[in-house]
């Protein structure tokens, strides 16, 4: 196995497809679906697993022989967007460009002008600001990033969130908490995070594979 990021999911899925008869992509089914679409993997070659508290639900009824098996997880922030959000923004801001993170639903990505990882969204905002001054860019991702991009390119273009999308877990990381942790590390008083030794080799291997495949 190997890990991937939203930025290199396409490269890693292509690699994984060459390693065997099928791939289990987890944990985000939307990133898996959108990556598969970009690579030309047809919908009939994919299957979103039905998982219950005891594992697979009625496995005999599931298409487990598909080329791509998708774990039914998602990012709660990105999954809340729907195609109507895009249509409403286009109606409110004629001529706007709409981009979104690939952890959004596939039907949302289908009606956007572009989709990509966080780094893609940042680069696209900079490109629009430089090449299309005065234009409007709608960005479908966690709102704090959108607000930072709007502030960074203020006076060049208008950058607006696709909808309300605040991650409560990210919001738990505050400047005060970060300072407290860094101060504890400097004072050698930080609470160590222990990982079971037997988990380290396979985890390291999956990360190393990603770096090697992506040429990093």
Where are these regions (language model features)?
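The feature marks the mature, well-folded catalytic cores of soluble enzymes
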Residues: 1-216
